[in-house]
């Protein structure tokens, strides 16, 4: 690989899976591996084969996929661990041993000399088996500097192809990382990787500092997954390199959001809304000043074009809303109120926001319809009937009958629960029509008790990036969820029609 490209070593399937609450099936690990390869990572750390038969089977299955990127396996500085990696038909081993005094004393109960010898033996064995070898001194940033240099020099002399510098408990800062990498470059003449944890929120900053100091590779995870506070986030690291430092990677940045969503879905770890690059709010605007600026020139309040990372910007009405933002939102639905009507709509939106209400597209359209004295949106999709079955030892199943422009369609699906099954059945029916994805689902109890009135809010998106929010309320959570989804679908369909009409008008003489 040309040195002008920074190497991306993705450890989502190993370190990322060590996130509390995450356990991936072999099938899901393969799905993520295929997506990571599509994204353009240079190396996938597929797992830690020695830990279990299931882990070994998953790594073997990933190795069988004939992916374009390199596939590595983790191994302690033990012959049996390295053998386990080879049993998976891998040609790349990432081997490690702890070198800090606290780890040596309390975990390994070894002397420095013993740890050094184990490191050398592991590298020599891996190379004798024809493997590509990357060596990590675990807890490197808390290891005595002179001893650390001695370890890395020794494994370099033993033949390791690369060394990796782990900031195992995220205890470093960029200045420390800078001096450390430069020190190590003075004793080894092989490529250096950096592996940072985010315990103090500095994982990405520390990784960038390492690259600036001469490292050529970073170990990262999708969505910053990992033990405790997680690892350096691939999407943040890559975009910072591209946009702030002018450094290249092989990553297809337009696939970052797609990859983030796939990993979030399969791991069950929700991405925080305000997370940089891939959080739901990263390209969302509610403030009137901001929406006005973005509509005039997106660079006023966006550092990058959202399409660079597979995103679309979106606007939301709220108590900070302004005339320009609300006007743009209504225009998506083909509504063009007069200036006086627009002022009244904005005033009513602000009143609702001041009362603490989260304003959906449905609320905005209801206000606009009232002020403009127009009927609501045409309901192109209506619920005719649906049935759900669930219980102990029963796979939740839903059958849904929809009327789409007065034609009847029926779909059935299974799910993790009755709501999941019902929403999947709706998506199955409407897939060819709109290819809708559920981006957000929120359930709130409006009243107390077991018969509480529940409110369901959803945000849906189609393949063209049209986004709509909707809500529904009722005593039955499943019915409310289904109705909210259908409301969202109708709004998407209306946006698509308006957009299509605009495109046709462009070519009308």
Report the location of each language-model feature.
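Alpha/beta enzyme core
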Residues: 3-8, 18-43, 57, 61-65, ...
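Catalytic alpha/beta core domains of metabolic enzymes, predominantly
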Residues: 172, 178-296
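A mid-to-C-terminal "edge-of-domain" accessory segment
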Residues: 5-6, 12, 245-412, 450-453
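Mixed-charge, glycine-accented linear interaction segment located at domain edges/termini
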Residues: 466-469, 473-502
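Active-site beta-loop-alpha junctions enriched in small/polar residues
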Residues: 14, 49-51, 74-78, 98-100, ...
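Non-catalytic terminal/interface segments that mediate subunit docking, oligomerization
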Residues: 18, 31-32, 359-468, 472-477
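Short beta-alpha connecting loops at secondary-structure transitions
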Residues: 68, 104, 167, 220-227, ...
């Amino acid at each position: 690989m040309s040195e002008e490209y920074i190497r991306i070593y993705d450890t989502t399937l190993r370190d990322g899976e060590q996130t509390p609450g995450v356990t991936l099936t072999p099938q899901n690990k393969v799905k993520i591996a295929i997506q990571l390869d599509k994204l353009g990572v240079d190396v996938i750390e597929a797992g830690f084969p020695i830990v279990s038969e299931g882990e070994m089977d998953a790594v073997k299955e990933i190795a069988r996929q004939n992916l374009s990127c390199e596939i590595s396996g983790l191994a302690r500085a033990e012959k049996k661990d390295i053998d386990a990696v080879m049993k998976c038909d891998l040609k790349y081993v990432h081997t490690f041993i702890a070198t800090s005094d606290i780890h040596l004393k309390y975990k390994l109960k070894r002397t420095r000399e013993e740890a050094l010898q184990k490191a050398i033996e592991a590298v020599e064995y891996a190379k004798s088996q024809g493997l590509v070898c990357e060596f990590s001194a675990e807890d490197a940033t808390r290891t005595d500097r002179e001893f650390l240099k001695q370890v890395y020099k020794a494994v370099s002399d033993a033949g390791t192809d690369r060394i990796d510098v782990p900031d195992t408990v995220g205890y470093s800062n960029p200045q420390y990382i800078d001096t450390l990498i430069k020190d190590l470059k003075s004793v080894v003449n092989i490529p250096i990787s950096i592996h940072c944890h985010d315990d103090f929120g500095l994982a990405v900053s520390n990784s960038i500092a390492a690259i600036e100091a001469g490292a050529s590779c970073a170990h990262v995870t999708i969505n910053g997954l990992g033990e405790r506070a997680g690892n350096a986030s691939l999407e943040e690291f890559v975009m910072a390199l591209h946009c702030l430092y002018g450094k290249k990677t092989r990553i297809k940045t337009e696939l970052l959001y797609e990859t983030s969503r796939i990993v979030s879905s399969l791991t069950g770890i929700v991405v925080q809304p305000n997370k940089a690059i891939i959080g739901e709010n990263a390209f969302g605007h509610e403030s009137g000043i901001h929406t006005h600026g973005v509509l005039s020139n997106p660079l006023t309040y966006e550092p990058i074009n959202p399409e660079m990372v597979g995103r679309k910007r979106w606007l939301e009405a709220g108590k900070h809303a302004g005339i320009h933002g609300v006007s743009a939102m209504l225009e998506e639905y083909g509504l063009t109120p007069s200036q006086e009507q627009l002022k009244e709509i904005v005033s009513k939106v602000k009143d609702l926001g001041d009362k603490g209400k989260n304003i959906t597209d449905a609320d905005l359209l209801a206000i606009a319809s009232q002020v403009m004295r127009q009927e609501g949106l045409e309901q192109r999709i209506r619920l005719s009937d649906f049935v759900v079955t669930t219980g102990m030892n029963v796979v939740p199943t839903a059958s849904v009958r929809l009327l789409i422009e007065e034609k009847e369609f029926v779909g059935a699906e299974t799910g993790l629960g009755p709501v999941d099954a019902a929403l999947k059945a709706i998506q199955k029916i409407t897939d060819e029509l709109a290819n809708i994805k559920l981006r957000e689902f929120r359930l709130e109890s409006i009243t107390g008790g077991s018969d509480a009135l529940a409110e369901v809010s959803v945000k849906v998106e189609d393949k063209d990036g049209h986004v709509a929010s909707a809500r529904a309320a009722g005593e039955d959570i499943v019915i409310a969820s289904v109705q909210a989804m259908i409301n969202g679908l109708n709004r998407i369909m209306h946006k698509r029609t308006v957009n299509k009409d605009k495109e046709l008008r462009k070519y009308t003489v």
